[in-house]
Amino acid sequence: MSTPRPEEHQKFSAAAALCPLSNCQFSGVVISAIADEQKLEFTNKYKGSCTLLCSYDSQGIVLRIVLDADREHVLKEYMIAADTDAAQMGRRSYAVTLESDNLVLRFASDQDQQLFRKVVENVKHLRPKSVFSQRTEESSASQYFQFYGYLSQQQNMMQDYVRTSTYQRAILGNAVDFQDKIVLDVGAGSGILSFFAVQAGAAKVYAIEASNMAQYAQQLVESNNVQHKISVIPGKIEEIELPEKVDVIISEPMGYMLYNERMLETYLHARKWLKPNGKMYPTHGDLHIAPFSDESLYSEQYNKANFWYQSAFHGVDLTTLHKEGMKEYFRQPIVDTFDIRICMAKSVRHVCDFLNDKEDDLHLIDIPLEFQILQTGICHGLAFWFDVEFSGSSQNVWLSTSPTAPLTHWYQVRCLLPMPIFIKQGQTLTGRVLLEANRRQSYDVTIDLHIEGTLISSSNTLDLKNPYFRYTGAPVQAPPGTSTQSPSEQYWTQVDTQGSRNSSSMLNGGLGVNGIGDGSMDITHGLMHPH
């Protein structure tokens, strides 16, 4: 291992102590290939000594080999995993089988060999599978961390003004909870929340990030000169070790419908590092559920499925797949936004208490429903949104994804019924929503609705992992039939009002048509929000 500058040594030592799978490098390594296993004959693998670059990966350690004389070009890349064969050879050498290559690594010092051996052993002989690994398919975890390793995806979240500004306001508005405190940032991503904690006066922030975004977070920490405040630790919170308990945990663990991606379980798991009476930001989440009526949305999905009802598509009969096509389209939750007036009853609220709920509580979430119907119509399904609260010592701050609040990158979610039900004002709609966690970091969502006092019911099971992103950016339209005045008369009344305001400009030479001045008219409110 090359002799590091004092600050580099400090960084590596801290990382090694906190997370054995952290990034590290070893220089001056001579790599030999085993030419004959029986005679133990070796040949030099590369001309000249090499540097081994080790970096954390969700599946183990990525080992990249470069020449000491040319670190720009990677000669070979391997994955050190739990099934990697390896053994110590003397005080400075280490034998390892990577893919089909049998290698002997001779290190520059005894210490380097010991450190590398610890890195390998921490992958090979780790503790049993972490809670995260037990509940998550390998392919799902790989895709998940790859997705959040892109700067573009971090940018998408950071540019959500409502999200980012609300977090900053909640943290800075409760500086007393952060001043001189130890903070844990779970799933830190770019580290933006860690920076907010430092702005609020935090003494130390441990920023945990399992994707490759950790390296970018480290760059931001160093370029902003806060490396003495923020320690970026690559890894999963379920697998890393911290040197101390923390006063506050911050995170942005919410997914679509609050629970998607199952990051909330990771957030709750992090409480093992929280001191008694410590703070959680956010503190609790409310999932809101309401029946809705939207003939346009239902018809859109139904007509898509009818593609498979063609009996002569280029001479081919597709009708045998119509039933499966219909099932697939209606298994998709719809991610978009809507006018809250499509909701037929006041929403039911299901609370998740981040300070007290257990991880297991989120494996099967059974939510009883009872709605007093406020308007007669056809119920096409259930609409979902969530609010989270930051309960601070100085003030409480809410982040809302309600259709009545400014739009966020979470939008809202709607689950359709394949068989809608007609229901009258004053009737009671009962049922349940069952969220059953799966190993794809999501949930199977079952909705079951029944009109009390009748035999009328409808149900559906949807795959929250496979939503339909319907949002187009177009303004939300008011539901049909909500105008209580003539929209035409409303328009012309507003035109007349604007015309009066612009009369002075016409007298000063402004052009007018039919008595309307050339001044700008704002008719959006009248069209989009009729009274």
UniProtKB/Swiss-Prot annotation:
Do you know which Gene3D superfamilies this protein is assigned to? Hnrnp arginine n-methyltransferase1, Pleckstrin-homology domain (PH domain)/Phosphotyrosine-binding domain (PTB), Vaccinia Virus protein VP39
What kind of modification does the protein receive after translation?
The dimethylated protein is the major form.
Q: Which GO terms describe its molecular function?
A: histone H3R17 methyltransferase activity; histone H3R2 methyltransferase activity; histone H3R26 methyltransferase activity; protein-arginine omega-N asymmetric methyltransferase activity; protein-arginine omega-N monomethyltransferase activity
What are the annotated GO cellular component locations? cytoplasm; cytosol; histone methyltransferase complex; nucleus
The UniProt record lists the SAM-dependent MTase PRMT-type domain at: 141-450
Annotated GO biological processes are: chromatin remodeling; peptidyl-arginine methylation, to asymmetrical-dimethyl arginine; positive regulation of ecdysone receptor signaling pathway; positive regulation of transcription by RNA polymerase II; regulation of DNA-templated transcription
Keywords on record? Chromatin regulator, Cytoplasm, Methylation, Methyltransferase, Nucleus, S-adenosyl-L-methionine, Transcription, Transcription regulation, Transferase
Which transformation does this protein catalyse, written as a reaction? L-arginyl-[protein] + 2 S-adenosyl-L-methionine = N(omega),N(omega)-dimethyl-L-arginyl-[protein] + 2 S-adenosyl-L-homocysteine + 2 H(+)
| Ligand binding (S-adenosyl-L-methionine) | 154, 163, 187, 209, 238, 266
- Pfam families from the entry? PrmA, PRMT_C
Q: What residues bear Asymmetric dimethylarginine in this entry?
A: 501
Q: How is the quaternary structure described?
A: Homodimer.
The role this protein plays is: Methylates (mono- and asymmetric dimethylation) the guanidino nitrogens of arginyl residues in proteins. May methylate histone H3 at 'Arg-17' and activate transcription via chromatin remodeling.
Quote the PANTHER family the UniProt record gives: HISTONE-ARGININE METHYLTRANSFERASE CARMER-RELATED (PTHR11006:SF10), PROTEIN ARGININE N-METHYLTRANSFERASE (PTHR11006)
Q: Which family does it belong to?
A: Belongs to the class I-like SAM-binding methyltransferase superfamily. Protein arginine N-methyltransferase family.
Q: What is this protein called?
A: Histone-arginine methyltransferase CARMER
Organism name? Drosophila persimilis (Fruit fly)
Its lineage opens with: Eukaryota, Metazoa, Ecdysozoa, Arthropoda, Hexapoda
Gene that this polypeptide is encoded by:
Art4
